[in-house]
Amino acid sequence: MDYLLSSPTGNFFLLAGPCVIEGEEMALDIAETLVEITSKLNIPYVFKGSYRKANRSRIDSFTGIGDEKALKILRKVGETFDIPVVTDIHETEEARMAAEYVDILQIPAFLCRQTELIRAAALTGKMVNIKKGQFLAPESMHFAVDKVRSCGNKNVAVTERGVSFGYGDLVVDFRGIPCMQQSCECPVIMDITHSLQKPNSGSGVTGGVPERIGTIASAAVAVGCDGIFMETHRDPKVAKSDGANMLPLNQVADLLAKLTDFRTVYLKHTT
């Protein structure tokens, strides 16, 4: 937790990487690029990658390259670049296994009310990042945070990722960021890619509006989010999961530089 808030300039922290681990070379390539970018901008950086995608619409959707293989790649990324790594878990028995390889355990939005899953993550002693459900009010997230703290684990963060707006769209209520900062008393992260999903497609493949990533990110920084979460890929069109709402890797540097400038203005007027 201290690392995430350690920027000498007061900058936000970043959780970023591919949606799912597709292979070692791909993971190391993305991590190397993001480490280079974030080090120049004084952004504390955490590599993100799912070792398995359990939440798929279609039975034939890609879920992963194998749990152990993907987890070993995540650990190698962390060791190679000396950075923390985050991955998500979906069942209680995954918590202890994943905790052997990564530094932060993430609870998916659809599972943010699952008490035993949250407790299992918290009891590993790892930091826990809980994504707010698309169906949940910001004011209710402190109950999920309380479950982590009840286990004696104070290292917790929450992530905003949009609210369901009808059957096939999401919107972001930016009031939720300061609301959760106040009620949860922990860092609040903005997921700037999943919040632009177009879920429940008739094809069974989630769509997105990636051209609005900069808009969502800028607004989140303007209201004082503590961290940014994003998924990125060299070529989102060939990504095996969630390519429709990823930010191309070659656009990350410019976006983060702009957001860093916005953060400087925010701090000037709030401190």
Residue ranges and their predicted role:
Residues 59-68, 104-111, 167-171, 195-222, ...:
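Active-site-adjacent loop and "lid" segments of alpha/beta metabolic enzymes
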Residues 33-41, 60-86, 121-127, 177-189, ...:
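Alpha-helix-loop-beta-strand connector modules within alpha/beta enzyme cores
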Residues 5, 219-271:
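Structured C-terminal cap/extension of enzyme domains
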Residues 65-66, 80-94, 103-116, 127-138, ...:
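Catalytic beta/alpha-barrel core
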Residues 1-15, 72, 264-271:
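N-terminal amphipathic alpha-helix/helix-capping segment at the start of soluble metabolic enzymes
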Residues 14, 18-26, 45-67, 232-243:
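Glycine-rich, proline-tolerant flexible connector loops at the mouths of alpha/beta enzymes
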Residues 124-232:
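Catalytic alpha/beta core domains of metabolic enzymes, predominantly
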